Amino acid sequence: MKKEIILDLCGGTGSWAKPYKEAGYKVITVTLPDYDIRKTILKDGHITFVGKDKSHMVVAKAVYGILAAPPCTMFSFARTKARTPRDLKQGMECVRACLDIIWSIMEVKQETKFKKCPLQFWALENPYHGFLPKFLGKPAFTFDPWKFGDGYQKKTAIWGYFNEPIKKPVPMTDEVKAHLKGNRVMNTVKFNYLKSKDIHPEVFGKFDRQTRLAITPAGFANAFYKANP
């Protein structure tokens, strides 16, 4: 049984890290309301995640891999009707916190002699159509959920150091062919156009719409795990 530690930063429902957890890895999900990533303490080779009434300490050199999904609220181009103005400085607070954790572990475990990356992998996710690419530059990998077997469009960007997952597009069925007559892409529905009940319907009623919007599609999550075990 795997004992390696996976940090699931701003993990929400834990959907991206789910395949690792099911495979026996020790997944530590750092997300609100349990922990505020911005209050993380990095000191003496240890990482302490701080919550309102609890904390959790991790030895930096024990971390195997990191998945990070900082909130896209302030970055997404879809933010057009929000009551509060877009605040990119506020949005970057969680991004900086995630990167600080990643970099601190890379520094602690540096083994120049063996020319190996301290972390086996790290990846940071956010919508492709947003402002974060203007801060972090060109992403290492981009995908739409339909390219991994999930039936919708939501172009996503991934930055980091990892093996690229193998894409497995939605099968070209007669139904898909019929829809394609008026569309230039495999999928016919953009994520933002889905009815609320159709956004990850498997957890409709359990999580609110905003939480379900942030769920990592299962097809991609499984493919990422297989490429980065």
Residue ranges and their predicted role:
Residues 1-229:
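Conserved active-site and SAM-binding loop architecture
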